Amino acid sequence: MTADEVRARINAKRQELVDLIATIDAAGLSAPGPDGSWAIKDHLVHIGAWEHWLLALFEGRNELLAMGTSGEVNEVDDINNEVWQRHRDDSIDEARRYFEDAHRDLMAVLAEKTTEDFDRPYPSSFDNAAGLTFLTPVAANTYEHYDEHIGWIKEMRAKPAQR
């Protein structure tokens, strides 16, 4: 996949997510999920946090600290929980701003990347990442991630939390 194709795929799937979010009112964005956990606004923060992780990867910074975690956990569920704990009381506006700012900053960096950049191996602290190229975390933390959360958000809307 060329760099332009990567960016086009990111932009298309991101727009699908943004369009979905635009159909949800404030009450829907802040209501807990069917299991009583993450609200839709928490999904936005989560996506933004992983975009911060990806941005830090390209900038050579500590990815976990860039997400706002303690940097002391390395299991994905623990990382996600730390991010949620830190941001769960954020307002809808704060969650949106975090989501939008992370994406803007990431896309500014990705705009400069070439196909060769995406094809280079990347260093990772995750055990299962040996030998993967930069395209793998780019896909996993952008268009594949958006698609995953689009599905969950649609499920949440179909089956809201019991009040």
Question: Model-derived features: where do they sit?
Answer:
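Alpha-helical transition-metal enzyme core signature, strongest for iron centers
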Residues: 10-17, 40-55, 84-86, 92, ...
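Long, hydrophobic, amphipathic alpha-helical segments used as structural scaffolds
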Residues: 55-58, 62, 110-117, 153, ...
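Hydrophobic secondary-structure block in the mid-to-C-terminal portion of proteins
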Residues: 124, 128-163
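Short, helix-capping/interhelical loops that line the mouth of catalytic, cofactor-
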Residues: 1-5, 53-99, 158-163
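Hydrophobic, well-ordered secondary-structure segments
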Residues: 3, 8, 15-19, 28-29
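Short, solvent-exposed segments of well-ordered alpha helices
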Residues: 1-4, 34, 38-41, 93, ...
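Acidic interhelical loop/turn segments
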Residues: 21-37, 104-138
